Amino acid sequence: GYIDFGEDKENEFEIEWVNTFNYFFKVALMYAKIGEADTAYHALIRLIKCLYSGTQDSKMFDIEDPFQMLNPNWDQVYDTLFSTMKQVIKDSNQLSLQAIDMWIMTNFKSTEQVLMCFNDLPSIESAILLNIEEHEYHWSTQHKLYQLLKDVYKIAAPSFDEVALIKKLVRFNSNFYVDLATCYMSRYQWKEALNTLLSVVSHLTHPSLNEEAELKLIQCYQKLGMYKDAFDISKAIFLQDQTYSLYLKTRILAAKADVLQEFLADIQPLLTFSNDRNRNMNILRICSYEGYCDRLYYFASNSKGAYGNEYRNYALKSLIYRVLFPKSLQQMNLLLFIHFIKEDASLGIIDMRKYVLTQDIQDKLLLDAIELLKQMIQYQIDGHKRHTYEQAAYECLLMKEIYEYLGMSDQFDTYYSQLFKVNSRRPLLKEALRKHVGYPG
């Protein structure tokens, strides 16, 4: 028969190059220990350049990050690399350029060591600015270089003017205006920050910066008392990414801008379910927070698929918490259930807006909770496992205590007797029910 040795050969190659590199790193460190700085430095340079090439071409080592495969003491390697570099390269300009190159090639993991290597501020700044210019199409690298330059200044000139520093960088990339605005904000110069952001928000080249700039704009508008402008941006962000946290922020701004009712009316068409679990959970949280209990119940009770029981569980907690917290109850399991809801700190529930409810509405919401429990119990029974039967029994106990609180224990007795009858051939289920709830009748 045909035997494929290809995978074994690949594994042998992987083990061989890893062992070889680990050995060469040990040898380079040994040379440094015996005072052969020049030999150690050039060996480490070649090893790191080779590994860096592998990060740029994954076919070279058949792995995206070959550094992760090796196990030398990287702190010791970087300490030795930059200390020997400082001994070998005497010209401060050349030293700064080489140090920056190596810092980039180590995937920015040698910041502590590269900072110890620098000794001349003008040459360091010149080298970093040159690299920022050369990496014009790599914003992430440019920004890390800026952060390194800032760290250098914190050590060499702690009282430096960060605004002046950032203004040197905006000519290389307009994205740096966001950092400039951030700096103004840290100085409580809200007007300057606002004008800076407005001048650049439509010219940003990195996707993550757009949202960052918009959030900073909202903050600036708020600080300047321009709530309608802050609300307009926040609403636009919320419409794109309908998270619960964004909803709350936008709602607060709507109230401050005196457009809350218009906002609540505008979002009603958005409160619909889809196939997106995260979006659906956010819809449930909003409905729970606002007290849209009928809609909450409708969504949960009509949900199918893998997440249906999760939605029902959330809606159940919301309905019970709205009606019964913080009432004193004689039903101990129900009381514990409410305690666990509070401990769990479910968003949209523990922070919900509370309203005065008539007794009829309270009773209706608890009856809706019972209907959800019936669905949840059947879901657990259909799981056909001992642990799902145990969960079904616990949910049955909660239902019993809700009926008891409502003064409708006879309705639970009817349901419970029928449950036993329908599931007469499920001894494990009946055992769990008897243990938690008791015998029917």
Where are these regions (language model features)?
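Eukaryote-biased, non-catalytic alpha-solenoid scaffold regions
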Residues: 1-441
